[in-house]
């Protein structure tokens, strides 16, 4: 392996991907046909005033530009032939999937705690079929995209994500969405433990909590679990001559 070769999956012959993305801590290479763009939980609950995070006391005022950059990343991915995976976090209207007092989720979920404090919000927060659960209007899945519900922070927990990725030969996961320090990081970590290469487009994510949590999550990811880049670099890498080259 060349000393200056980018990080990323290599096939049995040692060939790395045709797309090289500038990233921290080093560039990473991937092929479009073995990569997916994952959009994590871009629901009204997490990105819109009046949604769960807002009602629970988290600041969602800066999510507008994040939504715009996710839309850019989705458009770039589709143009390059990269499949898009959308996650929606939540539970059935009776919250059976959320777990009862015997589950740590019952004790730690801020949505469940908010509804216990405010009973009038019951069956309105993160319940399937509600406005809160729905994706924001500006981001719409298209035919060919994959849309998956998930009942916990990680997109690998109790979902078919892993089998769907392996069936398609996917090796690289590019992440956008909310919240960087919760569901994005949890899913990327679980992907790392399953031998997937994880990349976060930092400016297409947003934290739940103060800005220091965004910085800490990204630092943790680039140091231990994956790579960190941005939407402009992703767009430029996908439109490069090298990216258009068909491997021999």
UniProtKB/Swiss-Prot annotation:
Q: Give the EC number(s) listed in the UniProt record.
A: 3.5.1.110
MF terms per GO, please?
hydrolase activity, acting on carbon-nitrogen (but not peptide) bonds, in linear amides
What PANTHER family does the record point to?
ISOCHORISMATASE-LIKE DOMAIN-CONTAINING PROTEIN (PTHR43540:SF6), PEROXYUREIDOACRYLATE/UREIDOACRYLATE AMIDOHYDROLASE-RELATED (PTHR43540)
Q: Which reaction does it catalyse?
A: (Z)-3-ureidoacrylate + H2O + H(+) = (Z)-3-aminoacrylate + NH4(+) + CO2; (Z)-3-ureidoacrylate + H2O = (Z)-3-aminoacrylate + carbamate + H(+); (Z)-2-methylureidoacrylate + H2O + H(+) = (Z)-2-methylaminoacrylate + NH4(+) + CO2
Q: Which family does the record claim for this protein?
A: Belongs to the isochorismatase family. RutB subfamily.
Q: Name one GO biological process term.
A: uracil catabolic process
- Per its record, how is this protein called by name? Ureidoacrylate amidohydrolase RutB
**Known role:** Hydrolyzes ureidoacrylate to form aminoacrylate and carbamate. The carbamate hydrolyzes spontaneously, thereby releasing one of the nitrogen atoms of the pyrimidine ring as ammonia and one of its carbon atoms as CO2.
- Record lineage: Bacteria, Pseudomonadati, Pseudomonadota, Alphaproteobacteria, Hyphomicrobiales
């Amino acid at each position: 392996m060349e000393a200056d070769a980018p990080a990323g999956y290599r096939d049995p012959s040692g060939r790395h991907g045709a797309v090289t993305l500038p990233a921290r801590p080093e560039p990473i290479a991937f092929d479009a046909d073995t990569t997916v763009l994952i959009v994590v939980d871009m629901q009204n609950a997490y990105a819109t005033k009046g949604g769960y995070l807002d009602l629970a006391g988290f600041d969602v005022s800066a999510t507008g530009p994040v939504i715009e950059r996710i839309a850019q990343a989705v458009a770039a991915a589709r143009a390059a032939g990269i499949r898009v995976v959308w996650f929606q976090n939540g539970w059935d209207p009776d919250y059976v999937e959320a777990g009862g007092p015997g589950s740590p989720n019952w004790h730690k979920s801020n949505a469940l705690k908010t509804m216990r404090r405010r009973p009038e919000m019951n069956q309105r927060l993160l319940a399937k079929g509600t406005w809160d659960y729905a994706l924001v209007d500006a981001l719409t899945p298209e035919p060919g995209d994959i849309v998956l519900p998930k009942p916990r922070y990680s997109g690998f927990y109790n979902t078919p994500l892993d089998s769907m990725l392996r069936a398609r030969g996917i090796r690289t996961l590019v992440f956008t969405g909310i919240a960087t320090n919760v569901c994005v990081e949890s899913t990327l970590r679980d992907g790392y433990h399953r031998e997937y290469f994880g990349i976060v487009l930092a400016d297409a994510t947003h934290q739940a909590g103060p800005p220091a949590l965004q910085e800490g999550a990204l630092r943790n990811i680039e140091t231990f679990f994956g790579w960190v880049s941005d939407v402009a670099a992703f767009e430029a890498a996908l439109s490069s001559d090298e990216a258009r080259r068909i491997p021999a």
